[in-house]
UniProtKB/Swiss-Prot annotation:
Hybrid [4Fe-2O-2S] cluster binds at H249, E273, C317, C405, C433, C458, E492, K494. Catalyzes the reduction of hydroxylamine to form NH(3) and H(2)O. This is Hydroxylamine reductase. Its EC number is 1.7.99.1. The gene is hcp.
Length: 550
């Protein structure tokens, strides 16, 4: 086992990365190794997808499957070894079908890629795990060095984050052939084990630029189906009655659940990155979408144990449900998996609803505590002139984008302390689950404009980017000249690709934490600092002083 993709990876003087019987996330060595094997199979599939496009062959089954299966290897998504192997077998079957299509056009069609003809050696998980050793990401570290390995992983993990957003967009009916062609090209190239530093750096920026387009179609998918988010108050306390909790990012799953629970007497609560769903008109119209439950994903083993109803996980993040003994009432959807947990293959939630009706639910309603969400792209752009006016009248000094992933490290209290230290004449724009560090606190307003503005999920960084570009255009300056600072927390691969997106767009002087990614060496961090001004957090006092004086 070798896995260094998330923030909680093991760090030792001898090197970084989980490499024992189990990773810090709870992923076993078996599952981790089989995910490496799956990625190799997906690289071979992409190699043939690139070749097929040369012949004008576009296989939509391949295009929809490839990023979805890649998403299953993202942190805290799928811990179920047999399902990972199932994805690998499906990848090979699709590859062979695509290969046959190519051979029908040109009898001598071939692909020069080491993954292009990969076959699984056995049905036995142990033998497959041994085969997977051939594809462990650090197998040639001694030959290429830590810097090249780090750049490879930056590209691989960044592309994995983009694949997750591609799947979210695809679920909502969004498809862009250029994006999929670019995805396959990059995925296939990474399967050749590239070792050119400049080429890898260029690839990381290409992934960031591609992801900006992915976030654009994801935004289009969400807003075309569910309307543009508008500011909405959400209750974060319990309402009496039977209940279901839904977590993850998949708004379509939430919509289907709301439709199927309407009139049943079962209330629905959002958790984690589902919180922004309350801002969408076509979702909040359901009166039994009664509120948001819990805090950051890392607290789920305590909070889910206390929730008196079933739980549905639609995407990341799931962690071991046996710890809180709620594994008999947590359900996985789509690419999510945990051994022994019931999985919903389709969009029928009747079994979940039946379980909710058999459980007690909340016995009484707590005193409501309301927070505000729903500052989506359209709302943010509508406030651009107000922001400019406040800045020109010196009522608004600075905007801090304070967002990203949450996690378990104690150092993450930095982000709470930072938020509460932001001066009263400054605004906090937040997104993703890092907001749970401070989103239930009171920040007041500046002439009626809330000082805490929740822009949505991690992918809604797109809205923040569009706002920044709009403000810069209106003020006749560059984005880096705005009174705007980005202080981002990271945990997994979606955060990595958001960072690559921002860097590829030329955004500089981003501050990140709580730690640097374990796969980035001091040399690589120095390169990123020199090229983009990217740096790690220090103390709240020092960072605040520096950012306000920039």
């Amino acid at each position: 086992m070798f896995c260094v993709q998330c923030e909680q990876t093991i760090r030792t003087p001898a090197g970084n990365g989980c490499s024992y019987a189990q990773g810090m996330c709870g992923k076993t060595a078996e599952t981790s190794d089989l995910q490496d094997l799956l990625i190799a199979a997906l690289q071979g599939l992409s190699a043939w997808a690139v070749k097929a496009r040369e012949y004008g062959i576009i296989n939509h089954d391949v295009d929809s499957f490839a990023p979805r299966a890649f998403f299953s290897t993202l942190t805290n998504v799928n811990f179920d070894s047999p399902r990972i192997v199932g994805y690998a077998r499906e990848a090979i079957a699709l590859r062979e079908a695509l290969k046959a299509q190519c051979l029908a056009v040109e009898a001598n069609a071939r692909v020069d890629n080491p993954m292009a003809d990969l076959q699984l050696v056995s049905d036995d998980l142990g033998e497959l795990q041994r085969q997977a050793a051939e594809f462990t990401p650090n197998k040639d570290k001694a030959a290429i060095g830590e810097n090249i390995l780090g750049l490879r992983l930056l590209c691989l993990y960044g592309l994995k984050g983009a694949a997750a957003y591609m799947e979210h967009a695809h679920v909502l009916g969004q498809y862009d052939n250029d994006i999929y062609a670019q995805y396959h090209k990059i995925m296939a190239w990474l399967g050749t084990w590239p070792a050119d530093m400049n080429a890898l750096l260029e690839c990381s920026m290409e992934i960031g630029q591609m992801n900006f387009k992915v976030m654009s179609i994801l935004d289009a998918g969400e807003t075309s189906k569910y309307g543009h988010p508008t500011p909405t108050q959400v209750n974060v306390k319990a309402t009496a009655g039977k209940c279901i909790l839904i977590s993850g990012h998949d708004l379509k799953d939430l919509y289907n659940l709301l439709e199927q629970t309407e009139g049943t007497g079962v209330n629905v609560y959002t958790h984690g990155e589902m919180l922004p769903a309350h801002g969408y008109p076509e979702l909040r119209k359901f009166k039994h979408l009664v509120g948001n439950y819990g805090s950051g994903w890392q607290n789920q083993q305590v909070e889910f144990a206390r929730f008196p109803g079933p739980i549905v996980m639609t995407s990341n993040c799931i962690i071991d449900p046996t710890v809180g003994a709620y594994d008999d009432r947590i359900w996985t959807r789509s690419i999510v998996g945990w051994p022994g947990v019931r999985h919903l293959d389709g969009e029928d939630f009747s079994a979940v609803i039946a379980q909710a009706q058999q459980m007690a639910g909340f016995p009484y309603s707590e005193i409501p505590h309301l927070i505000t969400v729903g500052f989506g792209r359209q709302t943010l752009l509508g406030a651009a002139d107000t922001l400019i006016d406040l800045v020109s009248r010196e009522k608004l000094r600075h905007i801090f984008l304070l967002g990203g992933c949450d996690g378990a490290r104690g150092e993450r209290h930095y982000f709470t302390d930072f938020a509460t230290s932001v001066p009263d004449d400054c605004l906090i724009l937040t997104l993703a689950c890092g907001k749970y560090r401070f989103n239930k606190l009171e920040f007041g307003d500046i002439e009626g404009l809330p000082r805490l503005v929740d822009a949505g999920q991690c992918n809604d960084a797109y809205s923040a980017i569009i706002l920044a570009v709009t403000l810069a255009e209106k003020l006749g300056c560059g984005v880096n000249d705005l009174p705007l600072s980005l202080v981002l927390s990271w945990f997994e691969q979606k955060a990595i690709v958001i960072l690559l997106t921002l860097l590829s767009l030329g955004v500089k002087n981003i501050v990140t934490g709580p730690t640097a990614p374990g796969f980035l060496t001091p040399d690589l961090l120095a390169v990123l600092n020199e090229k983009f001004g990217l740096r790690s957090i220090t103390t709240v006092e020092e960072d605040m002083k520096q950012l306000l004086s920039a």
